[in-house]
């Protein structure tokens, strides 16, 4: 069972900045592309990469803040998350501070569950959803290679299907730097550039 929530909102959508939601199946390489895009635009103060708060151990490729389930529940109850969800037995949240960045006109990039897309579109004025994907056999090989205990069954993770309704899809097979450049163009412009 997955729980999702968006912070209570007023009738006005949060903007004028952009919220770029990077979604996709386990093993698609979301963190790889996000980290490479972050490096490519490190000198751009208009782009902010959200740091997720999670109740599982972060891998070397992730820039997450690990907390206990009790601490997460306290943060959640205090309203400290802009978006939060539960999936695969863990809780995930994006700090409320990202709202201030978006109000200031910055672009915020976040790796999220596909299940928070609709709540995010209901809360923010400018949301771009980027689906990172790869063929099933590539996903399975990547999940097996990282051997993260929290991944559970590889078959279940690869077979999981949640509609994303993306604005843009990147098939992450081949050169990850080229795909990171594609992602950066979307981050900067809200869509791929010709």
Curated annotation (Swiss-Prot):
Residues given in the record as ATP binding sites: 24-31
Record keyword Nuclease present: no
Keywords of this entry: ATP-binding, Nucleotide-binding, Transferase
Enzyme class: transferase
One GO biological process term: organic phosphonate metabolic process
EC number: 2.7.4.23
Pathway noted in the entry: Metabolic intermediate biosynthesis; 5-phospho-alpha-D-ribose 1-diphosphate biosynthesis; 5-phospho-alpha-D-ribose 1-diphosphate from D-ribose 5-phosphate (route II): step 3/3
Source domain of life: Bacteria
Family per similarity comment: Belongs to the ribose 1,5-bisphosphokinase family.
Function: Catalyzes the phosphorylation of ribose 1,5-bisphosphate to 5-phospho-D-ribosyl alpha-1-diphosphate (PRPP).
Full protein name: Ribose 1,5-bisphosphate phosphokinase PhnN
Organism: Rhodopseudomonas palustris (strain ATCC BAA-98 / CGA009)
